[in-house]
Each structure stands twice: as C-alpha cells, then as structure tokens.
C-alpha cells in the first residue's frame, strides 16, 4: 500500500515528491509539510493494523524533507 499525496501542485507518492524537490522541479517552500503529516496521520488511524514498514518509510521521507528545508 503506497501513501499518495494530493496537493494543488503535486499528486503522487511521497518518494516522487522528494525526488522532484531534490531536482529543483518543485520548490520545497510550496509544499505544506504540516498538511501532508496531518493527512498521513488520518490515514494511519483508519488502518486496522499498522504496517510498520510503511510507517517507517514515511518517517524517513518526512525527515528527509525536513532536512532539505533546513539546508536550503
């Protein structure tokens, strides 16, 4: 199960969003990280059994986004 993001300027998986940010195809300041996190938490709450591998992947991607924001 892949978590997909739905934003005004992007729709797709989180790893693709990160790829576009790293290639400067999307501006990290245009990405509402708080909204992405809130939406993901809502999805996790709906899952009957949390797949920790998926949650771990999200945490890695979200952390990488935050680090990218700090280093810009």
Task: Name each model feature, range by range.
Residues 70-72:
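Conserved small/polar residues in nucleotide/adenosyl-binding loops
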Residues 14:
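Peptidyl-prolyl cis-trans isomerase
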């Amino acid at each position: 199960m892949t978590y997909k993001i739905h934003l005004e300027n992007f729709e797709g998986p989180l790893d693709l969003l990160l790829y576009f940010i790293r290639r400067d195809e999307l501006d990290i300041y245009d990405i509402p990280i708080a909204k992405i996190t809130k939406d993901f938490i809502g999805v996790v709450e709906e899952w009957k059994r949390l797949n920790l591998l998926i949650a771990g992947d999200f945490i890695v991607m979200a952390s990488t986004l935050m680090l990218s924001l700090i280093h810009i």
